[in-house]
């Protein structure tokens, strides 16, 4: 692989990582908001809240994969039709959540939960348009446009949410559902309008184009399987980490002080992994050369180690001894950090395939096994079992994804 191509690969990866880090600004705001929801007695059922957040992430991953596989084929109408249909399916899930909430909740929690679901219904359609526009700019190499738009919208989202929740909290009044969603929709519509204003003419939709989109019966698309695989594993990961969080809070309060800050670190390190993995997927689809797998593993592992050392240093400054925990959880935490990122990187190989490779099957096996061990950890009260349950899924995927791919598939493009 030439120095120019290698430099281009890493430059692209860091640009995608930069966008991922900016997208985490709302995630941090969401975490604070969820904390303050409990503090100010806003009674939205936590399982519904987490489900909707997870569905939004899965939906955006589906949209991105569909666009990556098809925009360069010029299938504009088919891509947008697929996004609209996926958004309609999201509405179907929201209706199911409303039905479950009506059947299982009572009083204020039921009213506020249903209101939250109903007011979230427009989000998939606007987010789908934004994903389409962002992928158009990505395909044209104009990543700086997306980075600029997302930076502004993330700050709007975080600022407005924290402003409303903070004012409510300090005034001693209860938050409203509308105040929580104002930041979300302001950020979404900011993106939608910003993209619409600068979107290239050939990628815009006239009235006739929209008629064509809604009249399509059979879509000429590739990559549906890859999009569904990416969405499926997102839901598995988020669901599993939510379960781990509940188990830690209920059964292992002694490590909660380390666990929850640790996942802020995981998000920061995963940004680079997402950038590397996406660059791999793009270059396999195009196709163009990229570094060999062992080089990517070395780059990400070194980065993870440096981030972890900073985390340990901050723990030390706070007068807490992470190494005093059972089974030296610091070592297992580092293993999780590296493996979680590596499986994001190697996932890029499978998502370049139209059917997503064997990602769905491997993910189901990994998190089923992790779930069994997590249940044992909760029953036995074993911190060691909890740590193993947490590490097992990413470790299994980081090893098994390259193992099940043929050598030809993994080394198809790099120069020999």
UniProtKB/Swiss-Prot annotation:
Protein keywords: Cell membrane, Membrane, Transmembrane, Transmembrane helix
Topology of this chain in the membrane: Multi-pass membrane protein
TM spans (from-to): 24-44, 48-68, 79-99, 114-134, 153-173, 176-196, 230-250, 255-275, 295-315, 322-342, 372-392
Localization per Swiss-Prot or TrEMBL: Cell membrane
Cellular component, GO annotation: plasma membrane
Purpose: The actions of the proteins TfxB, TfxD and TfxF are implicated in the processing of the inactive trifolitoxin (TfxA) precursor into the active peptide.
Protein name: Trifolitoxin-processing protein TfxD
């Amino acid at each position: 692989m030439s120095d120019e191509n290698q430099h281009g690969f890493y430059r692209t990866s860091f640009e995608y990582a930069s966008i991922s880090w900016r997208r985490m600004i709302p995630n941090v705001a969401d975490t604070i908001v969820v904390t303050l929801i409990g503090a100010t007695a806003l009674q939205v059922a936590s399982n519904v809240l987490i489900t909707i957040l997870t569905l939004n992430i899965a939906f955006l991953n589906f949209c991105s994969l569909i666009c990556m596989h098809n925009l360069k084929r010029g299938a504009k109408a088919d891509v947008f039709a697929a996004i609209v249909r996926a958004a309609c399916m999201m509405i179907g899930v929201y209706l199911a959540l409303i039905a479950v909430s009506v059947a299982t909740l009572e009083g204020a929690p039921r009213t506020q939960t249903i209101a939250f679901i109903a007011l979230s219904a427009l989000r998939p359609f606007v987010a789908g348009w934004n994903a389409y526009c962002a992928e158009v700019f990505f395909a044209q190499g104009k990543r700086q446009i997306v980075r600029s738009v997302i930076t502004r919208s993330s700050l709007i989202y975080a600022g407005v949410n924290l402003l409303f929740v903070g004012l409510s909290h300090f005034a001693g009044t209860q938050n409203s559902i509308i105040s929580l969603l104002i930041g979300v929709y302001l950020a979404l519509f900011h993106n939608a309008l910003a993209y619409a204003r600068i979107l290239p003419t050939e990628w815009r939709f006239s009235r006739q184009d929209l008629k064509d989109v809604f009249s399509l019966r059979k879509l000429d698309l590739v990559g549906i399987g890859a999009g569904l695989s990416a969405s499926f594993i997102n839901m598995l990961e988020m669901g599993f980490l939510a379960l781990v969080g509940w188990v830690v809070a209920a059964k292992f309060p002694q490590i909660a002080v380390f666990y929850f800050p640790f996942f802020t670190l995981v998000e920061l390190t995963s940004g680079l992994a997402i950038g590397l993995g996406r660059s791999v997927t793009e270059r396999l689809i195009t196709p163009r050369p990229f570094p060999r797998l062992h080089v990517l593993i070395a780059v990400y592992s070194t980065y993870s180690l440096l981030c972890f050392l900073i985390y340990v240093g901050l723990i030390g400054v706070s007068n807490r001894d992470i190494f005093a925990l059972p089974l030296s959880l610091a070592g297992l935490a580092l293993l999780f950090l590296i493996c979680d990122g590596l499986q994001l990187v190697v996932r890029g190989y499978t998502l370049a395939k139209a059917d997503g490779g064997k990602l769905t099957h491997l993910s189901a096996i990994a998190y089923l096994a992790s779930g069994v061990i997590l249940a044992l950890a909760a029953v036995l009260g074993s911190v060691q079992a909890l740590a193993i349950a947490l590490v097992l899924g990413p470790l299994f995927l980081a090893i098994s994804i390259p193992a099940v791919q043929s050598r030809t598939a993994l080394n198809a493009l790099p120069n020999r």
